[in-house]
Amino acid sequence: MPPKKKKVTGLIKLQIQAGAANPAPPVGPALGQHGVNIMEFCKAYNAATESQRGWVIPVEITVYEDRSFTFITKTPPAAKMILKAAGVEKGSGEPHKTKVAKITRDQVREIATTKMPDLNANDLDQAEKIIAGTARSMGVTVEG
């Protein structure tokens, strides 16, 4: 008889600073209500994201019936990557009136290449269009 599959009891999506997960909110309460060992998750997450310090990394945590868990880390949000490439703190309050920065087509290609596994795109051209659209909606002009 094949081994039984674990029954999934919850899916938690969080965005946590890489290498800096701690039991304080928002991590503690989100995991606590599902009965997950918070310190175990924090140690595993920090070890997995140590190389990406400085970024906010989205994570998808699957919680099973026996309170064990698995997690998948995603690539940093496109908006954060665009802001870093443009060298600004935040996007424009009114993106279609006031532009806050400019990024080059090469920077867009670089971000699209990094984000490719998480994007709903079949090729790099489509991925670049998605990233350029995100940039436009933040008041960042794409040149080239």
Swiss-Prot record:
Organism for this UniProt entry: Streptomyces coelicolor (strain ATCC BAA-471 / A3(2) / M145)
Protein name as annotated: Large ribosomal subunit protein uL11
Gene: rplK
NCBIfam families assigned: L11_bact
GO biological process: translation
Function: Forms part of the ribosomal stalk which helps the ribosome interact with GTP-bound translation factors.
Pfam families assigned: Ribosomal_L11, Ribosomal_L11_N
GO cellular component: cytosolic large ribosomal subunit
Molecular function GO terms recorded: large ribosomal subunit rRNA binding; structural constituent of ribosome
Subunit structure: Part of the ribosomal stalk of the 50S ribosomal subunit. Interacts with L10 and the large rRNA to form the base of the stalk. L10 forms an elongated spine to which L12 dimers bind in a sequential fashion forming a multimeric L10(L12)X complex.
